[in-house]
């Protein structure tokens, strides 16, 4: 449950999972940058950045959209998945990574935010099942929103409301 995930994210010894989280950061940000610099899809990320260049919220969307467009348009760069999906892995991690960097958070805070986001995504997926009409990227987006609430020092009640209302 969310309480256990919150407790784990706060107490896990990061050294045991640092290598995995570094791979997630490096792979998923690399494809996001490729999506912004290359010609993939219709260029949603680039268009958003032109319309709203100074917004942190826009930047979260821009990088996630650019990564997804690159992946879905055949970019061969690897990504770190979540629950077996590349788009879920990117939506789970990229907003958290960009948010932490934009806010000047520590490396440890970033890692704990990623732990929280990844586990919330997995937790939500357990209630959906293997086959569903529900797109798992929505769970991942919800999880990254909850992780941002977590990174802002949100209480369990606030985090639960983020999950419920996303």
Task: List the predicted regions and their residue ranges.
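Conserved structured core elements
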Residues: 22, 54, 58, 89-93, ...
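Generic structural marker for isolated residues within well-ordered, non-membrane alpha-helices
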Residues: 61, 96, 145
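Signature of multi-pass transmembrane helix bundles
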Residues: 1-74
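Fold-independent oxyanion-binding glycine-rich loops
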Residues: 67, 94-99
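Acidic-glycine-rich active-site phosphate/pyrophosphate-binding loop
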Residues: 55-74, 106-125, 158
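Hydrophobic alpha-helical bundle architecture
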Residues: 99-112, 122-166
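Conserved phosphate/anionic-ligand binding catalytic regions in large, soluble enzymes, centered on
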Residues: 75-94, 135-139
């Amino acid at each position: 449950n969310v309480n256990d995930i919150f407790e784990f994210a706060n107490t896990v010894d990061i050294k045991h999972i640092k290598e995995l989280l570094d791979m997630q950061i490096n792979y998923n940000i690399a494809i996001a940058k490729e999506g912004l610099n290359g010609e993939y899809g219709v260029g949603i990320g680039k268009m958003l950045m032109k319309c709203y260049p100074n917004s942190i919220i826009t930047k979260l969307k821009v990088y996630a959209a650019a990564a997804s467009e690159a992946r879905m348009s055949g970019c061969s760069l690897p990504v770190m998945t979540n629950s077996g999906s590349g788009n879920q892995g990117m939506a789970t991690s990229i907003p958290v990574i960009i948010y932490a960097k934009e806010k000047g958070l520590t490396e440890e805070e970033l890692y704990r935010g990623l732990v929280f986001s990844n586990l919330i995504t997995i937790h939500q997926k357990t209630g959906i099942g293997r086959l569903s009409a529900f797109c798992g990227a929505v769970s991942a987006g919800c999880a990254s929103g909850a992780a941002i609430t977590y990174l802002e020092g949100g209480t369990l009640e606030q985090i639960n409301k983020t999950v419920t209302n996303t």
